[in-house]
């Protein structure tokens, strides 16, 4: 059977951009591959470079710095904060920003000059200086990213549309996909959160999930099992009592497919599951079909 641009499975309709020969709908799921490590690096002057697993290793990120692109990650050369020669040199340089962006069906990693690592999920934008200042480390995030912040005397700030997260050395996930709130899951260490339109500052502890609400600038903190919120960073797709509508939204972004429902009633069905994020979409179809 030849199906073009539509796959039907359990009342779901999957749209792809190519024609695929299949014997049944679940077999077609084997042809839909997961996301890949790919990103666009935007340099000063809006110059853009595409980063893929096959991209040449050296990447000139400004006039004096060359990063290394390898295995789906961009790695900046380390600059020890205690090196006096480096400090004096930095004071005479203009701080330049780089921006790393991922699209639907993509992910990427970056290691900053201080040793901090960030894993960008799909549809994410991260803006940061090539070298941090001597007093603070500050980045700007839209989308979702998992941070492992290197220990340093300088505070590390993540700026989002809804608020600012501050820490010194810790591990956490930030999700800004919802226009209504920013979600922060703290794995290790301690962080504080300040809403954009407020001076209110709240600290959260490991194992807590915080929501920064756009409507009223309130911060709500919950003690939860963080596993479903950080599973994507560890190569899993974990859903706990999630609606099919919510699951479909995640699958669309990661597998780069468009999905619609045979009936609106299907959207509110709830599922719990634990899947390999790097497998084809077929196991998920079989689990919920």
Segments (PLM) and residue ranges:
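Conserved small/polar residues in nucleotide/adenosyl-binding loops
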Residues: 1-5
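A residue-level detector for the "anchor" residue at the start of short, highly conserved motifs
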Residues: 9-289
């Amino acid at each position: 059977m030849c199906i073009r641009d539509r796959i039907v499975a359990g009342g779901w309709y999957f749209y792809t951009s190519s024609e695929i020969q299949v014997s049944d709908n679940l077999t077609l799921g084997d042809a839909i591959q997961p996301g890949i490590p790919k990103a666009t690096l935007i340099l000063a002057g809006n110059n853009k470079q595409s980063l893929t697993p096959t991209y040449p290793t050296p990447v000139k990120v400004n006039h004096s710095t060359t990063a290394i692109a390898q295995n789906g990650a961009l790695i900046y050369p380390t600059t020890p904060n205690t090196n006096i020669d480096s400090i004096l040199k930095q004071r005479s340089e203009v701080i330049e920003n780089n921006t790393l962006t991922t699209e639907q069906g993509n992910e990427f990693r970056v290691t900053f000059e201080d040793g901090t690592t960030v894993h960008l999920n799909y549809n994410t934008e991260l803006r940061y200086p090539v070298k941090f200042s001597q007093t603070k480390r500050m980045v700007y995030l839209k989308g979702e990213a998992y941070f492992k912040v290197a220990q340093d005397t300088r505070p590390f700030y993540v700026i989002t549309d809804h608020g600012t997260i501050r820490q010194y050395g810790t591990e956490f996930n930030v999700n800004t996909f919802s226009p209504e709130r920013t979600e922060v899951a703290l794995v290790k260490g301690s962080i504080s959160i300040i809403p954009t339109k407020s001076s209110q500052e709240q600290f959260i502890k490991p194992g807590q999930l915080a929501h920064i609400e756009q409507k009223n600038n309130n911060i709500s903190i919950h003690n939860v099992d963080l596993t479903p919120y950080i599973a994507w960073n560890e190569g899993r797709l974990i859903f706990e009592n999630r609606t099919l509508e919510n699951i479909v939204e995640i699958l669309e972004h990661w597998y780069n497919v468009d999905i619609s429902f045979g009936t609106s009633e299907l959207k509110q069905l709830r599922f719990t599951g634990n899947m390999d994020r790097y497998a084809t979409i077929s196991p998920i179809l079989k689990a919920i079909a």
